[in-house]
Structures are given as C-alpha cells and as structure tokens.
A protein has these predicted regions:
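Residues at the N-terminus of a long alpha-helix
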Residues: 86, 128, 159-162
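Short glycine-/acidic-enriched loop or helix-start segments at secondary-structure transitions
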Residues: 31-32, 73-75, 125, 160, ...
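Hydrophobic alpha-helix immediately C-terminal to the catalytic Tyr-X-X-X-Lys motif of short-chain
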Residues: 97, 101, 105, 138, ...
Length: 259
C-alpha cells in the first residue's frame, strides 16, 4: 500500500493498532537527489497521512525509522543525539523534517513517538539490486563473480549496524524513549575499501573494482555514539561487523545455490 493513499485510514480503523512502527519510505539518497519532489511526497506527505490515521485510530505511539543522513557532514565525530543536523541530501532533509512533525504531533496532538536515527543497516534479505546497501550489492556481485563499483576513493566511512541489532532497538522503543530521537550505531566507522577487503577474505574471490565519482548527496564520514540509546532504550549493538558480513554473505550464497 502507498502510505500517501487515503485508504490507509480505513486500514488503521479496521485493525486499531496500539503502536505503529513506521519504516515505509523512499530510502534512496540517489533517487532523492534526482527527484526531490517524489522524495518529499513519500517521506513527508506519506508520514503526515500515517500520523493523521494514527490519531483517528487511537494509536498510542509511533516508532519512526529516521536516519543518520540527517546529520550530513558533521564538524566532529562521533555523531551524538545532540550533533547539529545539516543534511546533504533531500532524503536527509525529509527525515529531519519528519522528526519535527513527530515533535509537533506529540506536543500539540498527544501522539507519542520515538525516532531511531539509523547508521548503515545491513544483513540478510537486504536488496542487492538497488542503489543503496553496499554490503548486499557487493556480496551478490562476489557470488556472481562479477566486478564491483566503488564510488569516491573508497575511504569514505559509515557506521554499519546489523539488522538484528536494529530490530532489537525497535522493540526497545515500544515502551521506552518517549519523545526522543536516538542515533543507532556501533560506534565504529568502516571504509568502503575495508568492506571490500573483508568480503574478499570471506569469499576467496578478489572482485575487479571500477571506481566512480562521489554520488550527489553522499556524506564523507559517519560514526555514531549511541550512549543515549543505551541509557534510555537499554539498547546496545552486539553483532561484530565480521560476524554480520559472514552471515549476510552466507545468506546470499544460499539464495544462489537455491536459484
């Protein structure tokens, strides 16, 4: 279902959810730079439809998937919940705007929320055919014995957080973190080149590399200090990057064998 569709309200009315976990979004930075109007339509107008439908259905709380992209290129690392938000892409802008709407709906309309500002989430079942999710894209390419593309110089860093850890953060937010916006990461920054080298070691295949320019909207570095999430949500990332990479690679390997 398109979250912008007016029929969303009828669904909420039928099922009467107590809590809404809102992950539906236009999530590609690249698409947001090519079509900012579409990005805003889904991520802002769609959110407002979800919030209005929630109010009418008597929803108690919304747990919202925000993004570390709201911070852009910070002056200092690691990024904390109090780091100034200066997004470098329309995607990051719409996620920041969404947080402001959530605050409004809490203070003026009585709808509670918790927003989770994710690092780079990865893991099994991630789409390897899109423009986002370098680990899934690399893993699938390695298994097909194809080359990979590395944008920029490959030394740009991200805080890669495993999907199971992120799922736990969402469960924690069901009853905790009222009105809070929390960065969700491991506290470790890893370059794209390092991800490539780790997958070479896991797969035993050195994929040919093609270099490309920086993509519009991409930030240079990201590293998140989730101390506030530890205190308020009682959450901590527990999966080592190497373990998550291995599990993700094995998942795509199983798909390749089954296919």
């Amino acid at each position: 279902m398109d979250i912008r569709d007016e029929s969303l309200g009828r669904v909420f009315g039928e099922f009467q959810p107590e809590v809404v976990n809102h992950h539906a979004a236009q999530h590609s930075v690249a698409i947001s730079t090519r079509d900012p109007m579409y990005d805003a339509s889904v991520n802002v107008t769609g959110l407002l439809n979800v919030l209005e439908s929630s109010l009418k259905a008597g929803v108690r709380k919304v747990v919202f998937a925000s993004s570390g992209a709201t911070f852009g290129n910070p002056d200092h690392l690691p990024i904390t919940d109090d780091t100034p938000q200066r997004p470098t892409s329309p995607y990051g802008i719409t996620k920041m705007v969404a947080e402001h709407y959530l605050r409004y709906y809490q203070t003026e309309r009585g709808l509670d929320f918790t927003a989770l500002r994710y690092g780079n989430v990865f893991g099994p079942r991630q789409d390897p055919n899109g423009e986002a999710g370098v680990i899934a894209i690399f893993a699938a390419s390695f298994l097909r014995r194809e080359g990979v593309r590395i944008d920029w110089d490959g030394e740009q860093t991200r805080d890669y957080v495993y999907a199971i850890d992120v799922a736990r953060a969402n469960v924690c937010a069901l009853e905790r973190g009222s009105g809070g916006c929390y960065v969700i990461g491991t506290g470790i920054k890893t370059s794209v080149n390092a991800i490539y080298r780790a997958l070479v070691e896991i797969s035993g295949f050195e994929a040919p590399v093609t270099h490309a320019p920086r993509r519009p909207g991409d930030a240079r570095d990201a590293q998140f200090d989730s101390a506030q999430a530890r205190r308020d949500l009682e959450w901590l990332a527990s999966t080592a990057l190497t373990d998550g990479l291995q599990a993700t690679y094995e998942y795509f390997k199983t798909l390749a064998i089954a296919g």
